[in-house]
């Protein structure tokens, strides 16, 4: 009986994993002039309507949970490279909306990329619970398989783009897969311990609320498991990473990116760090500059097939 139960549990687990990424619903939506104009600056609005794009709300499976997300597909072109975007925020906080998804990612879609994003489990309309780098990492990984059902998607060319908390999901995903051709992380959480020391309320707030068992145990290992600074050597070395950081970021101090860059250097992980003097958490003051760097980074590795330079110290 014991072995039968183990076999049954294995079958259930295998079945759930096999379903990961299955696309359940894909519903087209439209960005109206009136709604988007109220939510974005003039230059962003012009960018949004610059080229023809099809926007969709999606529902897909991740660990048997129904998870919501978005996808944007350029109307022109075939066999397009893809970007998985990992949003900031947690649960319902800073969720993507029809307009904000389009606003944040229009610059990539207008450059010929399909962009797909998860709301993460536990957000409004999605099942499960956001664990801030726990099971929700599978919500990101599952999108690799969801892309197989997206029209025009070339799944041999996938990049990943995370912002703020989205850095946790991005870096953890890069410890599990090596098929991501390039990654970009902006204003990223990279050391939850030093971040907690800087923002005291994280300990009793975000960490205790979202990370299973942390509120009761205060076990710092739970924070280290979610901090790229502590698992940098496990991140695939086949994915070059672009780090973007502002020096005036109140939410994520520049020391997070600087110390992570040092760690990446030590483990010989391919990366580039760009620091924007006076840049805040969104880097809105440097919008055009950082977006140009992001496009160039993805173009290099997803379009041009560039190989990262040799990192070995030599003459």
Predicted regions and their residues:
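N-terminal cap/lid segment of alpha/beta-hydrolase-fold proteins
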Residues: 31-77
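Short substrate-entry loop that stabilizes the transition state in hydrolases
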Residues: 78-80, 85-128, 192-193
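Mobile cap/lid helix-loop segments that gate and shape the active-site cleft of serine hydrolases
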Residues: 95, 194-234
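Alpha/beta-hydrolase active-site loop
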Residues: 131-151
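Short glycine-enriched nucleophile-adjacent loop
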Residues: 145, 167-178
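Short beta-strand/loop motif that positions the catalytic acidic residue
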Residues: 235, 242-245, 249
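Conserved alpha/beta-hydrolase "acid-adjacent" motif
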Residues: 250-256
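C-terminal catalytic histidine-bearing segment of alpha/beta-hydrolase fold enzymes
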Residues: 258-315
